Curated annotation (Swiss-Prot):
One of its GO terms (cellular component) is cytosolic large ribosomal subunit. This is Large ribosomal subunit protein bL19. GO terms for molecular function: structural constituent of ribosome. This protein is located at the 30S-50S ribosomal subunit interface and may play a role in the structure and function of the aminoacyl-tRNA binding site. NCBIfam families: rplS_bact. InterPro entries: Ribosomal_bL19, Ribosomal_bL19_sf, Translation_prot_SH3-like_sf. Keywords: Ribonucleoprotein, Ribosomal protein. GO terms for biological process: translation. Belongs to the bacterial ribosomal protein bL19 family. Signal peptide: none annotated. It comes from the Bacteria.
Amino acid sequence: MSNLLKEFNEQQIKLLSNREIPKFKSGDTLRVTMKIFDSAGERIQTFEGVCIKRRNNGLHSSFTLRKISYNESIQLQVFLYSPTIESIEVVKFGKVRRAKLYYMLSLFGKSARIKERIDRSKKSS
């Protein structure tokens, strides 16, 4: 039974992964563009925030973004293979030492900043 479920999940991932999914980790700043369906119809909305956690679980993979707007912390959990997602873009690579940044939930202002990670492999001569 588990093999059947595994095959089904792999088929669904192939169907839903028609867009480019960049490599990112927690601490990276992401810009997610998604379709929002409401009573007026369909519109496109972008959400830019720091990735607090990433959960890799096949078809049910997800990540949580956090941003501060008007002194209020806003969190958004996004499923990686959701059909409502238009694009995922990495704005900045963060340098952190943990996989889950739950300590960031209580931080605001300058204390919530994350250092930028410099990729040494793409160093120009």
